UniProtKB/Swiss-Prot annotation:
GO terms for molecular function: structural constituent of ribosome. It comes from the Bacteria. HAMAP family: Ribosomal_bL19 (MF_00402). Keywords: Ribonucleoprotein, Ribosomal protein. Pfam families: Ribosomal_L19 (PF01245). This is Large ribosomal subunit protein bL19. The lineage of its organism: Bacteria, Bacillati, Bacillota, Bacilli, Bacillales. It comes from Brevibacillus brevis (strain 47 / JCM 6285 / NBRC 100599). The gene is rplS. Gene3D superfamilies: 2.30.30.790. One of its GO terms (cellular component) is cytosolic large ribosomal subunit. One of its GO terms (biological process) is translation. Belongs to the bacterial ribosomal protein bL19 family.
């Protein structure tokens, strides 16, 4: 039974996901349905965590919008995500960057890795 579930999940995994880690700034293209129309909405922020594996894998991106911190959690393999772009790679020493919630302004910056 477990093998069948794993095979079904494997068929639903997206193949075009770029390799990004916490600390990277990502731009997520999300499909939004408004009435009869479907449009693409961008969310650009720092990836502060990745958790889970397989079909249940998620990541959380954080940005500051008009002085207010906004965090949004996305399932990695959802069909609602059109694509994920990596804007810049950040150098961090933690897997979960929850400490950024307490930082304001320049203290919340992350050092960039040149690749």
């Amino acid at each position: 039974m477990n093998q069948i579930i794993r095979e079904l999940e494997k068929a639903q995994l997206k193949q075009d996901i770029p390799a990004f880690r916490p600390g990277d700034t990502v731009r997520v293209h999300v499909k939004v349905i408004e009435g009869q129309r479907e449009r693409i909405q961008l969310f650009e922020g720092v990836c502060i965590r990745r958790r889970g594996t397989g079909i249940s894998e998620t990541f959380t991106a954080r940005k500051i919008s008009y002085g207010v911190g906004v965090e949004r959690t996305f399932p990695v393999h959802t069909p609602k995500i059109d694509k994920i772009e990596i804007v810049r790679h950040g150098k961090v020493r933690r897997a979960k960057l929850y400490y950024l919630r307490d930082r304001v302004g320049k203290a919340a910056r992350i050092k960039e890795i040149r690749r």
